């Protein structure tokens, strides 16, 4: 009888105080851009580069690096869609723009080995897209005569959807 009481008491304690790992939930939630938002971002970026006289490709990826939208202007080089995708992927993967990554991974720096990560591309034009302090996607631009111009176009595109990203 005492054993049954003891067993019941121990069982009650375990049920009353569930085991947990640092109070972490079993599931997480996150925000991603809708397809429509990604399309607006890509088109606004392409339009800005066109206005500046450049034919480019633009790729928008979600927070996991999966392509949501890719646009290639009529005379953009055949390599530009893949280059834009890799820039966008690099920006979200390393959580920083690719101009900064280019600087931080130059030959001779402690981070130079990052340049050998498959699909990583350390060339200007990749920028993470953030909303309320969280990365919700990334954008990559390729085709302007320099990564700095690709980067400028990407940032103009992001600014064009800023009101959609506020929550």
What are these regions (language model features)?
Residues 5-18:
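Bacterial N-terminal signal peptides
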Residues 1-2:
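N-terminal secretory signal peptides that target proteins for export/translocation
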């Amino acid at each position: 009888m005492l054993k049954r009481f003891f067993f019941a008491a121990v069982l009650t304690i375990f049920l009353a105080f569930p085991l947990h790992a640092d109070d972490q939930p079993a599931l997480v939630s996150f925000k991603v851009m809708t397809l429509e938002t990604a399309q607006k971002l890509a088109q606004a970026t392409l339009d800005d580069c066109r206005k500046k006289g450049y034919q480019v490709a633009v790729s928008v990826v979600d927070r996991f690096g999966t392509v949501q939208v890719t646009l290639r202007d009529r005379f953009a080089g055949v390599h530009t869609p893949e280059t834009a995708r890799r820039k966008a992927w690099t920006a979200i993967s390393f959580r920083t723009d690719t101009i900064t990554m280019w600087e931080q991974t130059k030959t001779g720096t402690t981070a130079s080995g990052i340049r050998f990560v498959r699909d990583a591309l350390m060339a200007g034009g990749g920028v993470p897209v953030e909303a309320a302090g969280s990365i919700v996607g990334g954008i990559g631009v390729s085709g302007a005569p320099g990564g700095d111009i690709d980067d400028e176009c990407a940032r103009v595109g992001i600014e064009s959807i800023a009101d959609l990203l506020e929550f």
